[in-house]
Amino acid sequence: IKPTWEKLPEDTTEDTLVVELDPGTAFGTGMHHTTRLCITQMKKYLQKGQKLFDVGCGSGILSIIGLMLGAGEAMATDVDPNAVAAAIENAKVNHIDMSKYDVKAGDIITDADFRHTCGDEKYDLVLANILADVIIPLSGVIKDNMKPGALFVSSGIINTKEDAVREALLSNGFEILEVTHSGDWVAFTARK
């Protein structure tokens, strides 16, 4: 992951997956622990051709990497229109096929109509790298967008909120497959 204004390191090989990124005012440079936790889980679980949903997409880094890793299509949403603009621009910089990438501004937690326009029971993998205080209510509604057996990877969770997120996932019927840590941060991988 490199800023658009920097050159590639000389030791970069042809096999290296390079993502160019200009987050603008949106979160997501790829350097934060939570972003790396999500990328690691996505690389582990995403299968070629699967449908990906990036909730709270910020710069679009997770959905862009997902498409570069072989996702068949991706939806990205954020409540901030500036984040949506940044995600679209970053997708273009990385030569993402925009017919496979849809980015929308809206709140899937409070706006059921918006949530349903994003796709009912459509996604194989949902990523949410946002705050625990958002993941907790999100866990109560995101299943509407997930296929049976789909995975939900959530991070942006400070370790002091780990138990609250675990309880929300379990009480909303998720099966927790993995809990990963980096620094003071936590990621959950859960199955619908």
Locations of regions flagged by a protein language model:
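Short, flexible, glycine/charge-rich loop motifs used to bind or transfer phosphoryl groups or to couple energy/partner
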Residues: 9-10, 42-43, 65, 92, ...
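S-adenosylmethionine
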Residues: 79-192
